[in-house]
């Protein structure tokens, strides 16, 4: 099975000049675990996750600061034509929970999260809260 068959395509993205506050609000309101930071060409520049949000609040970083100051850079990605097994190995070896999926030109086309793997492996469906 290829990554493109199990990835989520409607990924929430933001620009690196968005504020931290705006990103945290998006995580909360959309019930998501990560936001992919993209450039004007749709290429992945970084990622901001729930764990990043907790770190930012704990370190008392000003919430009006831009995401570029706190996002994780040098993001691990995977090609959409990669296999499920390749994606699984990448997630495990890098200890990550969110894996942006890119096309051959490096443009972000989807996202694989640990929840997608659990669903694929064990048929576990995660329901969004009301």
Where on the chain are the PLM-derived regions?
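Bateman (tandem CBS) regulatory domains
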Residues: 1-11, 65-75
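The conserved cystathionine-beta-synthase
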Residues: 13-31, 38, 78-95, 102, ...
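Nucleotide phosphate-binding site architecture
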Residues: 4, 12, 21, 54-55, ...
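A short, polar/charged loop-to-alpha-helix boundary motif
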Residues: 54-67, 118-130
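Cytosolic regulatory modules rich in charged/polar residues
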Residues: 83, 104-130
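Conserved protein kinase catalytic domain
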Residues: 7, 24, 45, 54, ...
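A glycine-centered beta-loop-beta connector
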Residues: 27, 35-51, 91, 99-115
């Amino acid at each position: 099975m290829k990554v493109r068959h199990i990835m989520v395509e409607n990924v929430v993205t933001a620009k690196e000049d968005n504020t931290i506050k705006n990103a945290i609000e998006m995580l909360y309101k959309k019930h998501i675990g990560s936001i992919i930071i993209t450039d004007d060409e749709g290429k992945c520049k970084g990622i901001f996750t729930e764990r990043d949000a907790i770190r930012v609040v704990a370190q008392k970083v000003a919430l009006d600061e831009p995401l570029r100051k706190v996002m994780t850079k040098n993001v691990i990605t995977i090609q959409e034509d990669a296999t499920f097994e390749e994606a699984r190995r990448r997630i495990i070896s890098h200890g990550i929970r969110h894996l942006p999926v890119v096309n051959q030109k490096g443009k972000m086309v989807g996202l694989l999260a640990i929840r997608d793997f659990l669903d694929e492996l064990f048929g576990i469906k995660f329901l969004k809260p009301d």
